[in-house]
Amino acid sequence: MDEHNLDRHLKAYCDMHEEYQNLYATWSLNRKSCSEILKNVLLRYPHYSLHDASHAEAILSKIEMLLGDRIEQLSPTATWLVLHAAYAHDLGMVVQWRELQEAWSTPKFKEYLDLLTESEDKDLREAVLWLRQMEKNGDKSVLWPLRAVRSVQLIDAAYFRSQHASMSKNYIER
């Protein structure tokens, strides 16, 4: 068991100071909520590394290693904030179907697709070019649905990942 742990530090402090007990209660509830929400990141970004609760825990582990015994100097609100930051920073990577539809319907997104045709990322560039070719001519291949899904996933991931910080902020503020 780790000697220095942010969660245990917050719990111990809140157990000793009744006026802070709500902090630990909200952290516990929000950790569960965020963990469930972050499971959905894999649906939009299957080609990325995991961005679920295990990713948040890995971040916390690194922070705990860096802070060491200085964790004991953190106030309960600072500890609460660090814990939440580790879990909430990728909430903006969870994209709802409605948001996808809205994005794909905007002129801004069409301009983004134009930019991607010149992308240095070969897979992304080819995904856009292929979708445009499909739109123009159609594809008779048996595997076209799989290629369409893959192409759209690459484009969606690139578009929404670049905005995930502001989307995380908006999600938290809702």
Annotate the PLM regions.
Residues 45-81, 94:
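Alpha-helical phosphate/pyrophosphate-handling elements in metalloenzyme active cores
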Residues 1-33, 37, 41-43, 60, ...:
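Boundary/activation segment at the start of structured domains
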Residues 72, 76-174:
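Divalent metal-dependent catalytic cores for phosphoryl transfer on phosphate-bearing substrates
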Residues 33-58, 150-155:
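Active-site flanking loop/helix segments enriched in acidic
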